[in-house]
Structure formats: C-alpha cells, structure tokens
C-alpha cells in the first residue's frame, strides 16, 4: 500500500503533468479563466486518465508487447509498433463517451468546455500518461494509481491557475503584461513552486 501511496503522491506533486513536464498547455491556458470550468475540465481529465491508462496497460500487456500473444499461440509476434495508434483509439473512444454523457446530463458544463472537451483526445498530457506507463513498465494496479494521480495532478494545476487568474482580474497588472503575459509568468512561478518537490525521494 505504501508503494501505491508514494506513486500517487509522486505523480501529483513531483511529476506534475502541467507544471513539471509542461504537458497539455493548450487547454491548460485556454480553460483556466474561470474556476468552475477549470474544475469541470479537470474532473474530465481525471476520469479519462483513470480509465485510459489501465486500459492501455491491458492492451499493451496482452496484445502489443513482444511475446504478449503467447496465449494465442503466437509467441514471436511483436505488435508494439501499433502502440500509439491503439492508445489514441482508446483515448478517443473514452472521450467520446464522456462527451455524450456530459451533453446529456451536464449541458451547462458541456457548453462551457466547448471545443476543448473533444480536444482532450489530442491533449498530450493524456497520451503522456499511457506512454510513461509503458516506459516505466507499470503493472495494472500501478497503472490505475498512476492514471488517477496524473489526472489529478493536471486538474490540481488548472484549478490553482484558474483561481489565481480570477484574482488577477482585480489586480493592477501593467498594461504590457495583461492577458497571456501575466498568465505565462504565473505558470512559471507555480512551476518553480512545484520544483521544490523534485528532490523528494519516494
């Protein structure tokens, strides 16, 4: 259990998708203007990561990696070159299902997220979760914990940035830095804060 807690904490703070690896910056900046919308997208990312990382782990373990098809009598077959296509397919399917559910049950959030909800499919933070899982050779349980942690890390970062940006609306920001200028500086300062976790050994 301690191993899984360490993996979760490491995924959230030490290896934060947005503030340590700078992944998913497009949606991270565009949707972080309001806290409610940012939290909604953050929850969507958590759900997608929690499902896709372990699902892609199963696909890689039992279908794609070298020797994975031994159960089917094909021990020499290596389909790992199909990894990227498979992961994108799984992510696209999960995002499509999530999009339909939000449209039906939470239309206000669906409309607020707009084009950025289907763009989760090509959000590099989502793909990175599956690629890191393969690179680090996680098992199914580790993949599930890592999926939750990596999704939560991105959600935490976007919610924090949205809160800061809402406060900045009422701040006296120099004219040349208003808008994206102060946002980039804020992200950099947040990233410096998260860098303090980089020396933590878990």
Curated annotation (Swiss-Prot):
<comment type="subunit">
    <text>Composed of six subunits; NqrA, NqrB, NqrC, NqrD, NqrE and NqrF.</text>
</comment>
<keyword id="KW-0997">Cell inner membrane</keyword>
<comment type="similarity">
    <text>Belongs to the NqrDE/RnfAE family.</text>
</comment>
<keyword id="KW-0812">Transmembrane</keyword>
<feature type="transmembrane region" description="Helical">
    <location>
        <begin position="180"/>
        <end position="200"/>
    </location>
</feature>
<protein>
    <recommendedName>
        <fullName>Na(+)-translocating NADH-quinone reductase subunit E</fullName>
        <ecNumber>7.2.1.1</ecNumber>
    </recommendedName>
</protein>
<keyword id="KW-0406">Ion transport</keyword>
<keyword id="KW-1003">Cell membrane</keyword>
<feature type="transmembrane region" description="Helical">
    <location>
        <begin position="35"/>
        <end position="55"/>
    </location>
</feature>
<keyword id="KW-1133">Transmembrane helix</keyword>
<dbReference type="GO" id="GO:0006814">
    <property type="term" value="P:sodium ion transport"/>
</dbReference>
<keyword id="KW-0830">Ubiquinone</keyword>
<keyword id="KW-0739">Sodium transport</keyword>
<comment type="function">
    <text>NQR complex catalyzes the reduction of ubiquinone-1 to ubiquinol by two successive reactions, coupled with the transport of Na(+) ions from the cytoplasm to the periplasm. NqrA to NqrE are probably involved in the second step, the conversion of ubisemiquinone to ubiquinol.</text>
</comment>
<dbReference type="GO" id="GO:0022904">
    <property type="term" value="P:respiratory electron transport chain"/>
</dbReference>
<feature type="transmembrane region" description="Helical">
    <location>
        <begin position="144"/>
        <end position="164"/>
    </location>
</feature>
<keyword id="KW-0915">Sodium</keyword>
<keyword id="KW-1278">Translocase</keyword>
<keyword id="KW-0813">Transport</keyword>
<keyword id="KW-0520">NAD</keyword>
<dbReference type="GO" id="GO:0009276">
    <property type="term" value="C:Gram-negative-bacterium-type cell wall"/>
</dbReference>
<keyword id="KW-0472">Membrane</keyword>
<dbReference type="GO" id="GO:0016655">
    <property type="term" value="F:oxidoreductase activity, acting on NAD(P)H, quinone or similar compound as acceptor"/>
</dbReference>
<dbReference type="InterPro" id="IPR003667">
    <property type="entry name" value="NqrDE/RnfAE"/>
</dbReference>
<dbReference type="Pfam" id="PF02508">
    <property type="entry name" value="Rnf-Nqr"/>
</dbReference>
<dbReference type="InterPro" id="IPR050133">
    <property type="entry name" value="NqrDE/RnfAE_oxidrdctase"/>
</dbReference>
<dbReference type="InterPro" id="IPR010967">
    <property type="entry name" value="NqrE"/>
</dbReference>
<feature type="transmembrane region" description="Helical">
    <location>
        <begin position="114"/>
        <end position="134"/>
    </location>
</feature>
<dbReference type="GO" id="GO:0005886">
    <property type="term" value="C:plasma membrane"/>
</dbReference>
<feature type="transmembrane region" description="Helical">
    <location>
        <begin position="81"/>
        <end position="101"/>
    </location>
</feature>
<feature type="transmembrane region" description="Helical">
    <location>
        <begin position="11"/>
        <end position="31"/>
    </location>
</feature>
